[in-house]
Amino acid sequence: LADGCQIAPTDAPNIISAADLVLWSTGFKRKANFVNYQLGQVMLDDASGLSETDIIVMQEVGKQSLTGYTVFGLDLGTTCHLIVSKSSGMGRMTVTHKYTIDYKVLEDELLRLIKIHRPTAIVSDTQPYIETVHRLQQKIQNLFGAMYINGNGLEPFRVIEKKSDETKSVLEQRQVNINRSVAFNILMDDIRESKIGLAFGVTDDTLTEHLTDMKRKARSEGTRGAVSDDSETLEYRWVKTKGNDHFHHALLYCHIASQLTQHRNISGGGL
């Protein structure tokens, strides 16, 4: 930064009045509800999202041996991000491997990793490559395509299959509609309840950056969105800060896949 100017709120009286300034600076029940994730040091608390402390806890949990089903969570993009985990089938999960895959070789590399790890269930992002997921589903019978929705209910996800919900399905085959905010909230809660671990050697700066990138922002009632003591917080929504959150999404898909092994009769093996 070569040049800069210091601007105070009172320098723009036609944009923000003194009364509004007082409201916005004092009318927050939680100071972390006054959000600016792009400039300066952010006011954060435990409700704002995952922190490096949470990552350390996940590493400690990951030291405990875990056997069970293998599940995949895949986030698509020019560079695809894959999380491989062991699921106990009873609510616990440990991340054992992570991979980055060039989209140009995704199909061959994914099939190779399936032969190595033999996942019971795979949940993959569908955007922006829905045709890729459809093609992969022809070869991989336990691959579910994930679609984010913004629902008002408490249900984190719902499986839609062609036979039962043909009019609601975007894919012709297996699809999982994920209630985005609710699912990320539950993922964070499970991490803090020591249900999700990171095995030795999995954690690095990239994973830490991705898991701590997104933060929760409160949607609430009140004057111009200010959260006062009398206002009621309706819900949180997860927002990007720097945009490096791909492994966080892959972990969520893996978390959903682990729940599919608990509630559905999915045969082992990927092919």
For each predicted feature, which ranges?
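Gly/Thr-rich phosphate-binding beta-strand-loop-beta motif of the actin/hexokinase/Hsp70
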Residues: G62-G91, A250
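Short, hydrophobic/amphipathic alpha-helical patches that form generic packing surfaces
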Residues: N36-Q41, N185, D189, H248-Q259
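Short, solvent-exposed helix-loop connector elements
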Residues: A226-K242
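ATPase catalytic-site recognition across NTP-hydrolyzing enzymes
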Residues: L1-V71
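Acidic two-metal-ion nuclease catalytic site recognized across multiple nuclease folds
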Residues: S231-T233, H248, Y253-L271
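Active-site-proximal structural scaffolding
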Residues: G27, K31, S65-T67, T78, ...
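Mg2+-dependent endonuclease catalytic cores in nucleic-acid-processing enzymes, primarily RNase H-like
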Residues: Q41, D45, G49-S51, I55-V57, ...
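Amphipathic alpha-helical/coiled-coil segments positioned at domain termini
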Residues: K242-G243, I256
